[in-house]
Amino acid sequence: MENRNTFSWVKEQITRSISVSIMIYVITRTSISNAYPIFAQQGYENPREATGRIVCANCHLASKPVDIEVPQAVLPDTVFEAVLRIPYDMQLKQVLANGKKGGLNVGAVLILPEGFELAPPDRISPELKEKIGNLAFQSYRPDKKNILVIGPVPGKKYSEIVFPILSPDPATKKDAHFLKYPIYVGGNRGRGQIYPDGSKSNNTVYNATSTGIVRKILRKEKGGYEISIVDASDGRQVIDIIPPGPELLVSEGESIKLDQPLTSNPNVGGFGQGDAEIVLQDPLRVQGLLFFFASVILAQVFLVLKKKQFEKVQLYEMNF
């Protein structure tokens, strides 16, 4: 009897452990799937549209600056840095999903030329690893190694993101050529205003869906509001739901118009995109250029020596 009770207890504990594990997985998966840049990866085959617009701007409506810095030229099969700067006021707080205030996160997408890719760990120097920190980059798609994404990560620590990039070698990759290539980048700070399904997040302004009078404002237990708007002409009632986060701008009894803001705009972040150019330089061309410069310098030296020799001859003839 005791053995049976022990077995039942063990079975119950195992069942609980499995249930807890499943719950953690679901919560974690939901959190990850709702994070930038997963939205873009799930909804778009290519993050850069034909117009040049990066798709992240579809959800992050405010425009903010970014800056990209890359070398002017690189040699084949060389690791170099692509530095993305996402500036913002570190004192700012954003509205989180639960309506509370918190620090801003940042994220980025780097679109490299075909053949360029994330440098393997064994090719990254200790100095470069220190600059990168604990960032974990990933490819936009398994077959698009030239498009890298990162985020969301804490903005206070990673407002400057260093990408370790490996340049291609045309000797081993037929698609690579010694040319000038464009590099495109997009970076955001803070949460977006619209989800991919078109619904609003709580990090944006909410407008009235009807003209009328605010009859009642009900504050919900978990935060947010239900605003009852009655149309004075026909008595039709509309209820607008406001999630936790935005601050209410209207009061009961107030007359409002269609699309009038009911709340403030809590968004303090935004998205920006930029571009740069990089040259994949042929080593033979560099060697030829160096040889040319050396030849010019030697020619100048010989010319000076010849001139001095000629002056000495002239001086000698004059004295003679």
From Swiss-Prot:
GO terms for molecular function: electron transfer activity; heme binding; iron ion binding. The chain crosses the membrane at residues 286-305. Residues 1-35 form the signal peptide. PROSITE patterns: CYTF. GO terms for biological process: photosynthesis. The keyword Thylakoid applies. Its cofactor is heme. Binds 1 heme group covalently. InterPro entries: Cyt-f_TM, Cyt_f, Cyt_f_lg_dom, Cyt_f_lg_dom_sf, Rudment_hybrid_motif. It comes from the Eukaryota. It is found in: Plastid, Chloroplast thylakoid membrane. Belongs to the cytochrome f family. Component of the cytochrome b6-f complex, which mediates electron transfer between photosystem II (PSII) and photosystem I (PSI), cyclic electron flow around PSI, and state transitions. The 4 large subunits of the cytochrome b6-f complex are cytochrome b6, subunit IV (17 kDa polypeptide, petD), cytochrome f and the Rieske protein, while the 4 small subunits are PetG, PetL, PetM and PetN. The complex functions as a dimer. HAMAP family: Cytb6_f_cytF. This is Cytochrome f. It comes from Triticum aestivum. The gene is petA.
